[in-house]
Amino acid sequence: MGLLAVMLAGVHRRCEERLARMTAIAQASQLALLPPLPPQITGISIAARYRSATPGASVGGDLYEIIPTGNGIRVIIGDVRGKGLDAILLARQVLSAFRRSAVATPALEHVAGEVSLAIRPYLGEEDFVTAVLVQIAPGGELTVVNCGHHPPLLHHGGGLRTLTGSTAAPPLGLEDDFTAFTASWLPGDRLLLYTDGLVESRNQHGDFLPEDHIATALLAADCDQALDALLAAVHRHTGGHGHDDIALLLLEHGADPRTAAPADTPDTERRPDAPDRKGTVR
């Protein structure tokens, strides 16, 4: 019995050590996919939040990054299908490719194409990555490329506007030809980027989170308070029983003249082969 007890104690200790190593790896991986962001860049206030569906759950494939470039501030938020190590590794490839292309490539739709091409060798048979890429130009105009992701929400004048182009695009990794569209970006506007855990949050009756709950939360005094209010609204709606991770990015247009939008900026859409074609944003 004494020998058996010693053996069992050894097995227990090794399991605890393995769990501790896996926890450390998960925490380091989450930090790599969801890096700390500065509170402000050239007059744009920034806040970010990540909430796992369940405490201690496997780190999923939610990711985000913000990079100042010569073409403006470039942002990505994305969601890799699945959880665990495979999702983490694929998400890291997405961020690595975005960081390279965001700095070196002039057109945002080409950045999306380069990221899509770069991650293709790492995709499994059923893998995919949805993402939204946003560029905030020095003049304040927004450029958006949506790769199969939930569309950004523009909070303006107390209401929400969904930013969508006229054509749907597939997730990253499936093709390399993407469409960009533009939208105006005015002082005081807030842009919310998010993963599906937000809009797919359901209550006990199966109802999704109402849009007016999001709009109300975004009225808070600053971006950090707004995201805290939004997560609190999700918690109340779901009773604390969310079924998916939530990553949130909120950017607010400040009064810095470098980010002031020109008056009457038209909404347009472009593809690499049709740079002047008009489009719509709803």
Task: Give residue ranges: language-model regions.
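Catalytic core of PPM/PP2C metal-dependent serine/threonine phosphatase domains
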Residues: D86-L160, T164-G165, F178, H237-G240, ...
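Conserved beta-strand-loop-short alpha-helix elements that form
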Residues: N71-G84, V144-N146, S184-H205, L250
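Membrane-proximal soluble helical/coiled-coil segments
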Residues: A24-E125
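Active-site-proximal, acidic helix/loop segment immediately C-terminal to a metal-coordinating Asp/Glu
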Residues: A87-A97, S101, A168, W185-G240, ...
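Transmembrane alpha-helices and immediately adjacent membrane-cytoplasm interface residues
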Residues: M1-A20
